[in-house]
């Protein structure tokens, strides 16, 4: 008999104190009934449609307000093929902004506010552009956590000024600039 295999959890993070919807993808997850987290206070229930039917592989997660920030593990299953392998899941304290596609040019970059966890999907070997307004001398931290959430994403972060001049960049896999 095959066994359940969890390939991704989206979004890979949630803000503590809120309820969020998670979608899982993988193999042999048909009729997955549960998500099991490394902290039992993270509770997810299968999402139901307007007719009360379970929406396949979609769950509603309640994240307790007092839960410690950090990484947790999650597994999916409970259906015909058992419980899956684990994936990382991050609990943070910043509101989340999901960008289904990142702009491919500086001119078409979406403006975002500071103080958000941005979840985006840059295309391979391409920049995914975002725009933020900063004041001269303002210090900010930009961090990519792709490798912390079981992602194949290997980031290169760069900061440009409005004329397109690169001000700072980093090519490490765990990027902080």
Task: State where each predicted segment sits.
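Acidic, Ser/Thr/Pro-rich low-complexity intrinsically disordered segments
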Residues: 2-45, 52-56, 63-65, 69, ...
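A short, sequence-level motif marking secondary-structure junctions
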Residues: 50, 90-95, 173-175
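Extended acidic/polar, glycine-enriched regions
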Residues: 65-95
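Predominantly extracellular/luminal regions of secreted and cell-surface proteins
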Residues: 86-114
């Amino acid at each position: 008999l095959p066994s359940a295999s969890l390939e991704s959890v989206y979004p890979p993070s949630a803000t503590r104190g809120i309820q969020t919807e998670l979608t899982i993808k993988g193999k042999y997850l048909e009729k997955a009934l549960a998500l099991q987290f490394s902290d039992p206070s993270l509770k997810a229930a299968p999402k139901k449609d307007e007719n009360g039917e379970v929406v396949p592989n979609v769950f509603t997660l309640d994240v307790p307000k007092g839960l410690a920030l950090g990484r947790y593990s999650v597994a999916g299953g409970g259906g015909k093929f058992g419980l899956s392998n684990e994936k990382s899941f991050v609990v943070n304290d910043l509101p989340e902004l999901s960008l289904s596609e990142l702009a491919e040019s500086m001119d078409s970059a979406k403006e975002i506010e500071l103080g958000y966890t941005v979840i985006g999907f840059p295309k391979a070997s391409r920049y995914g552009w975002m725009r933020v307004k900063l004041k001269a001398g303002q210090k900010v931290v930009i961090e990519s956590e792709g490798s912390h959430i079981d992602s194949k994403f290997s980031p290169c972060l760069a900061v440009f000024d409005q004329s397109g001049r690169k001000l700072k960049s980093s090519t490490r896999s765990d990027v902080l600039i």
